[in-house]
């Protein structure tokens, strides 16, 4: 792990062990915003992962998104170092597909 990535990891871990407990562990997403940012930086580097984390933190609020939101496996199409906002997903979540989402449930089954 490079020095900048390691420094970011230590800073995030420090936040998780200190301030996060004082603020209250009430993130609306899983994984938490700090864990998401840490994983994004580990997977995509400090620049891209940092922007992904910032976008996630901006979405986490009373009128923002919630639920399962995983770090993308690949960088978004069109993302480049000179267009940092393109790394982040500013709306919506990256939820895994579930078999239940495909099923149609009949609320009143027949005889």
From Swiss-Prot:
One of its GO terms (cellular component) is plasma membrane. It holds the Pfam family YidD. Keywords: Cell inner membrane, Cell membrane, Membrane. The keyword Metal-binding does not apply. It is a peripheral membrane protein. PANTHER family: MEMBRANE PROTEIN INSERTION EFFICIENCY FACTOR-RELATED. This is Putative membrane protein insertion efficiency factor. InterPro entries: Membr_insert_effic_factor_YidD.
